Amino acid sequence: MNYNYLKGKLINYGFPEEVVSINLITKEEMTIEAELYFKIAEVGKKFYDKFNGKSFGIGNDYKLNIIEGKSNKEQEKPKTKEIKYIYSYSAWIYTYYAKKKFEEGLILINPDQKEIQKKMLSHIISKINNTYIKGQDIINFAFPISCYDKRTLLQVFAYELGEAPFILNKVYYLQDPIEKLKTMTTFLISQLYLSVLRIKPLNPILGETYQVKIANLYCYFEQTNINPPTTNFYCFDSDNYYKIYGYVSISTKLGINNLKAIKYGDIYIEFITGNKYKIFYPSYYIGGITIGKRSFCITNSALVLDLTNRLVSYINFQAAKTDKNYDKNPDYFQGKLISIKEIKIDPKGAKHKILEEDTIPLAEFDGEWTRILTFGEKTYWRRKEDNLAKMYEMEYILKSDSSLRKDLILYNENKIEEADKALKDCENMQHNDILLRNKYKKAF
């Protein structure tokens, strides 16, 4: 690929000829892959348009996007293989669940649910002498593999970011802090409707990882603890506009026929513009684990904090339970944007309390977390069947990747007996690893 070829392509792309000449004259001898170069050019074009031609940094963008000292073949590029399963999972919310007024939550109508419940009940009865049934944290409680989702929890976390590239890219270009926070609120809601599970995902093994590309968002997850189950993550977009990072832990309590889950941790979204946000998730309640109607409910409250401007988006998921909103659907929520001086937060994110005397109200909103969010008469988010970004496997992944788990591979091939044995092998390996760690931990 020579200089004239690149120059012609970039002129066709829309760059003024004098700009192309100035910025490419020093790269005449370079040969790089066209696809990558034009991606860099796209970033440079945005800066050129933004500053009316006064600042065009394609040379700088080249240095930012290419690892210096490495050849073209050494650059990590994503595979073109698309992950197709996301489309069937996105259909769950409106094919497997019924939304009815006066119900505690969404009602699962999956025809296979009774069989799954039967297997789970039988397994729990066989373990009745254990302490699991008495309210102990059961996130690592093992069922037969046929009772599980065909994804690990790490893959579920990635799936919940299905709308992130579109929403966060929009936030980057907004100028008004309040409009940014409104759009960040839609980011949280978009994760909630994707968090609805038909059945329990597979527990990640300690040290298990997952790498995936969601549109232009590169995501890396690792299971760093199992008690409580904790996942660290780092995600960034290819334009370096923003990054998502931190950790999330899950605490669950099993009742006789229900499950309560709290998702908490340090979840940050940071933009190159300096804006930084922190998210606090609501709680989850699942009824009908073993008998009766299976229901899924989001409870308590959630927060999106603008740490840069001291603004808060407060979302109340108990709104449908008040007398005023008795006729609302079970997924109804209300919220408000406020300017704040101080905030009191439950360490595990179950209940978020705001000191009212230190707040200034800015806006109110409401919606249904399965389908819509509105500020006044304006709709800021609406669920669509084609909302999700495409997901791709990465070419270079660690051997600890979820997609390489033997039990998961066999399970997806419907080799249930072999998959069940492989799952038990994974659990035994992890159990032995824990014993070994504890032994040497005590030694020091």
Q: What does each model-found stretch correspond to?
A:
Residues 31-35, 74-77, 230:
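Short, solvent-exposed polar/charged micro-motifs at secondary-structure junctions
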